Amino acid sequence: MSRISNIYFYYMLVRTIIQVKGRKNMEKKRILITAGPTNEYIDEVMKITNMSTGRLGIELTKHFLEEGANVTLIATRSVFRSGLYEKYGLSNNPNLKGVPIETTEDMYNALESESRESYNMVIHSSAVGDYKPEFSFRMEDLATELAQAVHDGKTTREEILSILTNPNCKVNDDTKISSYEPNLAVKLTLTTKLIAHLRTWYKDAILIGFKLLENVPKEHLMEVARKLCIKNNMDYIIANDLHDLRQGQHLSFLVNEDGYQNVEFHSPDDIYETAKSLVLNIN
């Protein structure tokens, strides 16, 4: 055997040993991943959602399963029914626990419930909606209610605001709202910030979150991600810009409490390799 052949042989041998050892170590790891959007319902049919498909979460789930890890995936039902999920055959993997949800409240309950288990890493890639419908109303009805209040002498800011935030003219949303309401309005309210609870629930896990802004300077994106990391006691935030995504550039950056870590990602594979390195370095 030539010297070059010898070198190549030993290189491949060492590489194989490292891969086998890495897989054995990964088989001991438990990973929790959230993916896709959340759905907030206006009535029994209409909903508020976002553009997230859950692809990143599915890709990460696939990679971790291939390495032998045990994965819990919390995602909307649309993610579990997606072509990519079926393409990878994830539904038949015994190491995958799928937890279907719809709303932010559902995901909150699922995350809280799963915290009774021990996880090495939590990757919170779900695009959780910031707002949810509180109630719907017809603008004509609200105008009538406000006019009556003014007639009754209720003209202070606090009195008007009280009617606006809790009117008597709410539309019943227990069934489908009529399709012929020309002036239907929906009052939104904030959803629970799930990222704020992760460290309380998963004290010993590596926590990775995400931050998406649109068309901002890179320095601003990094600073917002850094502050998010500190505020919620996360280990890392992966930051990206919607402008880049729309241009077909899947560019994102790794940030921790100290700021940008000089690590760029250009694909889900890149994110997985970093996550893998992090989780294999813990005992």
Description of each model-found segment:
Residues S2-S5:
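Serine residues within intrinsically disordered or low-complexity segments
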Residues M26-N283:
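A cross-family phosphate/adenosyl-ligand binding-site feature
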Residues I7-N25:
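Short, Lys/Arg-enriched N-terminal segments with co-localized hydrophobic residues
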